[in-house]
Amino acid sequence: MVKIRSIEYGLYPRSEHVRLSISKWERNALDHKSLGKLMDAEKKEILKLFNKSGINFYTDPLINWQDILRMVASLSLDTPFEKISRYRETNTFYRQPLVESYPRMGEIREEESTPDSHLPGSMYVSDNSDHYMYFLPGIESFVNMSFLSPELNRERVMDSFLEIYLDLIKKHGMKRILLFEPYPDSHFYEGNWDIFGSAQVFYVRYGLTEGSFSERKDSGPFSLIASNEKEFDVAARHSEVPGIALMNSQNTYLENPEKLRKSATKMSSSLKLDEIFVTHTEYFDFLPHVIANKKVEILGKVGD
């Protein structure tokens, strides 16, 4: 019998209460500290939902798009964010990290926040459970989504970020990590192997192919998360427990958990796997908050 476990990660839609509170904050009708407390409280409630719903592994419910890049930028850059930039060819805009010199380890500036940079609130809100994963952007994606000064060597910038990641993992005791790679290079960054060897890594890499993921016998991600069935074959060959995004987070349709289980069982059985992770496509922040909550409850029923 195939063991099926569930994963929830990344951006999560704000409740109506928090959304209205942010509008007040932007009009200076709510102070910075009060909004930060509201956002932290909301994250804690979402984490309780994940746990209650039976989600096996989950990250901090990021409720601000900028938080994908926020921790690394605030930790390592003199001027964390610069101009507004478009994410690929989408309607999503974000404040681009500005890399003016080679990154170095610094102190996390959690309280630094303006309407033009990011919202207030703690960098991470953890429930300290065995289900919790720290969320970090992949180094390839972080660099691709940043503005690099022309005089900098790109490979050296990536190696500098690698040193910061390894220090961060050690300093904060990050035993379990969701490494999010939405904007990867065409060639796999070899420094990732050091990250794989430093923690239990769940690696979400868009556009996964044999050519985009090199192989080493000594280490690898604990779980490589695939976006579709074709990518799942690659994930199964290159990780201990592969994952597949079966739940659609782009529409409000509420899936049948048994049908998702059957799909996961069929895919894993065809490759003679003993275990598989099931998660969602993209992230839930496109959905209304109440629909996202229902999808989480369904996803929890998919896992054992």
Residue ranges of model-derived segments:
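Domain-level signal for soluble alpha/beta catalytic cores
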Residues: 1-304
